[in-house]
Amino acid sequence: MRLVQHISELPPECRGAVVAIGNFDGVHLGHRAVLNEAAGIARAKGCPLGALVFEPHPREFFQPQAPRFRLTPLPEKARLLGELGIDLLYVERFDAELAARPAQDFVTRILVKGLGVTHIVVGYDFRFGQNREGDVSFLVREGEKAGFGVSVTSAVNTSSSGEPYSSSLIREHLREGRPRRAAELLGHWWRIEGPVLSGDQRGRTIGFPTANIRMDECLEPKHGVYAVRAELVEGPGAGIYDGIANIGLRPTFDKQDVMLEVNLF
């Protein structure tokens, strides 16, 4: 997968894709319906498969002081999208200029002149442009004028509750301490990724060596103790381990930072 961050300067091989558009926070099963639709169209047309995301997340831009809510920071999102077969991941910076851009301008500058899209796929509730003025009906009309196709996927409901798959519902499950319910909606276990911090090493003295990760970018789930599987991706101890994790204030030594502290078996 190729990561593309300068949409206004695309080489020819990065244009003309079938592009799924969204924030895709969590890359959950509802998102996968959009991505699978795009993949099928890309195969039929013989075009590259792309995804267009926005960084920072628009909510982070408009509410910078709000509690952290991200299910998947960009590196994790890119990993998941790559596993789903995305060829081109377009990352458009969300800033004051983009927030103030009319929907018509978004279509002209980004979709047509920037990406040169062949076809786009969005969810039924997709909104864009200044004050969220653009909706899927507007997008379909503009696509007809500009010569690109538009597909709109309907809501995908969960089998258990009948509710639509949504990042908001997954966040609620995690904040209420229901990781298994969250995993059912994600289609995979929720994952926290980050560098292991150098601690005070006192865990070794009581027989429980730990790996500590600061939770700076992602949602803070309900504090408590969880059974986990941990992967160390580099170093002499690289591998996959079972473990027990505490999420919250470091209870052993009365630290005040919110941490993910994993005891590895």
Annotate each predicted stretch with a short phrase:
Residues 199-265:
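Phosphate/ribose-recognition catalytic cores of enzymes acting on nucleotide-derived substrates
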Residues 28, 81, 120, 182, ...:
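Residue-level signal for inorganic ion chemistry
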Residues 2-9, 69-72, 90:
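Short acidic-hydrophobic, aromatic-tinged amphipathic segments that line or gate anion-handling sites
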Residues 97-209:
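Classical nucleotidyltransferase
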Residues 69-77, 101-107:
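Glycine-rich, highly charged phosphate/nucleotide-binding loops
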Residues 11-73:
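N-terminal catalytic cores of NTP/NDP-binding nucleotidyl/phosphoryl-transfer enzymes
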Residues 73-90:
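A glycine-rich helix N-cap at a beta->alpha junction
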